[in-house]
Amino acid sequence: MLKAILYYILFLAEYLSTIFLGGFLVGLYMALNIPSGSHSQQIEGLEESIYPFMIVIGFLGILIVWFTFGHYKFSRFSLGKVIPAAKWKAMTICTMPILGFTMVFYSIMNLFHLDFLPKQMMDISYLGFLPYNIIGSFISVYIFFGAIQEELIRCGKKRWVQLLTLSIMILPASMMSATPSGDINVDLTVLGFISLCYCSWIYSKTRSTIILIVLYFVSNLVPFQFESKVLGILLLIAGTALTIGGFAALSRKLPEMLVKDED
């Protein structure tokens, strides 16, 4: 348990250091490139030009975390208990329920015109969000599941203790997700908690970070903002079918895709 807390503290130290360094460099860049008396349109254009810079900083943070946790074997990418011959089947079936639920969630939010996106996500295009998807998927899986939950499992902690610990550790990220009015984004927090519960359960069964990387990345490919009601209805129907079918397939197929415990 102590190791899991130490991993979290180490991750926070590296993550915050990257943020402070990135914030300093971005602030310096804008200070040097914004002339005095600039119009708001010029400032907005300059803010858009720093997105690639922020993405580079994000990937730099990934490299730092990967080197630290990989070099000292705190975490690693592996298939875990998944049989290698069944890896593609496992990736598909494990992804179906959370992908379907995400489709249902986004379709309901858009069909009922509910404001659930933080301002930062509203300003980013679908393709522009992909790098952040990669960064977020890596951090979530490599640190919170591959290092922290893995250590909790090795310590013999019960599943509810694992989930409670992960929820507390991820809480600061949920607090940072605010609506345009400045309130805590309850909708995305609920989606994040449900995703956390599902991914924690999948990891406890498979012990596979590779499966979870695919799961996180694919579920984040669902378009989160659209105006077409037809698309919303189609996503709602397809998402419901994927969720129900995915859980049914998991209950039947998951045990046969895992290595049998020796005991």
How would you describe each model-predicted region?
Residues 9-71, 127-128, 233-241:
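Alpha-helical transmembrane segments in multi-pass membrane proteins
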Residues 16-35, 67-71, 102-111, 174, ...:
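Short hydrophobic alpha-helical membrane-anchoring segments
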Residues 3-21, 57-60, 92-102, 163-168:
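Alpha-helical transmembrane segments
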Residues 30-50, 71-143, 149-150, 154-155:
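Juxtamembrane helix-loop-helix connectors linking adjacent transmembrane helices
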Residues 4, 8, 126-262:
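Transmembrane helix-loop-helix hairpins at the membrane interface
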Residues 1-9, 71-87, 254-263:
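N-terminal juxtamembrane cytosolic/stromal segments of multi-pass membrane proteins
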